[in-house]
Design a protein with these regions (language model features):
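Active-site-adjacent loops and short helices of periplasmic peptidoglycan-processing enzymes
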Residues: 1-109
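Domain-terminus/edge residues, biased toward the C-terminal soluble/receptor-binding domains
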Residues: 88-92, 100-105, 109-192
Length: 192
């Protein structure tokens, strides 16, 4: 949903791909998956998109949240409202990164709805989800979505992992003229 909000802001002219977003102390302190941004540094919106897609960078998620919502809590409220407007009836966000929070919840159906709406509403940005590698500050990060490399036709969308729910995946492919979206929650390993 964080990326949906970024694409929405780009579409409405609130952000530009080359715009630089400032890193706060809170963003710097995020763990465990991060780029290692430091307070006072900046990152372009385009690099932020790629870092979120390939690395699931939690520090970058907070940078984006603060740029769009002033605070991460306010941004989470904005995401929840947007989710409801998209028909994601059982989703509540409490942070921008997807890190554990007892009151943050979603369903496979709602994540499939989000994927479908990302593809439909922002086709001009969907290609980012097919990014296999992202280089930033002399480091290269590989996309965690190994299906991009393993299965012809898979063109996105996003992986995730937290201890509470295990390995999660929303994947999409276009075959025989039809778009297929699959959602898996609770995998015991990335391979499963």
């Amino acid at each position: 949903m964080t990326l949906y909000m970024v694409f929405d802001a780009l579409e409405r002219g609130k952000l530009k791909l080359n715009q630089r977003l400032k890193v706060s102390r809170r963003a710097q302190g995020m763990a465990p998956s991060k780029l290692g941004l430091r307070r006072g540094q900046t990152i372009t919106v385009k690099d932020a998109i790629l870092a979120l897609i390939t690395k699931s960078a939690n520090d970058v998620a907070v940078v984006v949240a603060e740029a769009l919502g002033k605070t991460e809590i306010n941004f989470a409220k904005m995401m929840t409202a947007k989710a409801k407007s998209l028909g994601m009836r059982k989703t509540r966000f409490r942070n921008a990164s997807g890190l554990p929070n007892r009151r943050q919840i979603s369903t496979a159906r709602d994540m499939a709805t989000l994927a479908r709406r990302l593809i439909k509403d922002y086709p001009q940005f969907y290609h980012f989800f097919g990014t296999q590698r992202f280089s930033y500050k002399r480091r290269t990060y590989r996309n965690h979505n190994k299906l991009l490399r393993a299965y012809p036709g898979v063109d996105g969308i996003k992986t995730g992992y937290i201890r509470a729910s295990g390995f999660n995946l929303v994947a999409s492919t276009k075959r025989y003229g039809r778009r297929l979206i699959g959602v898996v929650f609770g995998g015991k390993s990335a391979k499963s």
